[in-house]
Amino acid sequence: MVGSSEAGGEAWRGRYYRLEEVQKHNNSQSTWIIVHHRIYDITKFLDEHPGGEEVLREQAGGDATENFEDVGHSTDARALSETFIIGELHPDDRPKLQKPAETLITTVQSNSSSWSNWVIPAIAAIIVALMYRSYMSE
């Protein structure tokens, strides 16, 4: 269902937008973002955003939930954001926003030579022995 461009109030309740529609609104003439599955038309707010227009435009047409929460917006900022809601992301599109958990993969090079495992300690032992001998001869 296509929603109206009227932002704010409770008029947005029950208005759903498909992800493809939201993704089209990614420019300075029409800037929409998704935060917690709600669609915000922030076009008129770009110039007023305390963090600058660029941070909002980077998120335009996509899910800005993580960035919104990471910044730690004030209660006033959260209340102000409510005035820009125009609808919700269609329930069928919500799984598309789920990001896979990041996995840290550590690899060990199997071609590390075994000579370095004994040569380096052997050289260190020789240096220590020479230093000890030099110290004892004084």
Swiss-Prot record:
Subcellular location: Endoplasmic reticulum membrane; Microsome membrane
Binding of heme, residues: 49, 73
Topological relation to the membrane, as annotated: Single-pass membrane protein
Broad class of where this protein is predominantly found: endoplasmic reticulum
Cytochrome b5 heme-binding domain boundaries: 14-90
Tree of life domain: Eukaryota
Chain ranges passing through the membrane: 114-136
Matches recorded under Gene3D superfamilies: Cytochrome b5-like heme/steroid binding domain
One GO molecular-function entry: metal ion binding
GO cellular component terms, semicolon-separated: endoplasmic reticulum membrane; intracellular membrane-bounded organelle
Pfam families, sorted: Cyt-b5 (PF00173)
UniProt xrefs under PANTHER family: CYTOCHROME B5 (PTHR19359:SF150)
Similarity annotation: Belongs to the cytochrome b5 family.
Biological function: Cytochrome b5 is a membrane-bound hemoprotein functioning as an electron carrier for several membrane-bound oxygenases.
The protein, known as: Cytochrome b5
Gene name in the database record: CYB5A
